């Protein structure tokens, strides 16, 4: 049995972020620093009341340990308001 931190899989992230220039660059830099490659990104329309946007990211396969470290860093960004979903995606 492999330790959880050694598992490698794709990840689905849904984030609520501040609608400011450079936010996506901050997020991709953190993921890149942990050797996590982005497969796709979708940004939903801005909520005019809260001035936040929903960003959905699908990654290429990455190690669980790296993803957990990246998530920890993302939670400390003032521009990331919430990590709404974090889902491991297995190929079947």
Question: Where do the model's predicted regions map?
Answer:
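A conserved regulatory-domain signal marking ACT and ACT-like small-molecule sensing domains
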Residues: 1-92
């Amino acid at each position: 049995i492999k330790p959880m931190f050694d598992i490698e899989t794709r990840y689905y992230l849904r984030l609520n972020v501040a609608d400011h220039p450079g936010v996506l660059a901050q997020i991709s830099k953190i993921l890149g620093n942990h050797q996590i490659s982005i497969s796709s990104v979708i940004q939903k329309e801005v909520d005019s009341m809260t001035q936040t946007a929903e960003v959905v990211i699908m990654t290429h396969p990455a190690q669980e340990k790296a993803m957990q470290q990246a998530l920890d860093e993302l939670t400390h960004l003032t521009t990331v308001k919430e990590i709404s979903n974090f889902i491991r995606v297995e190929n079947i």
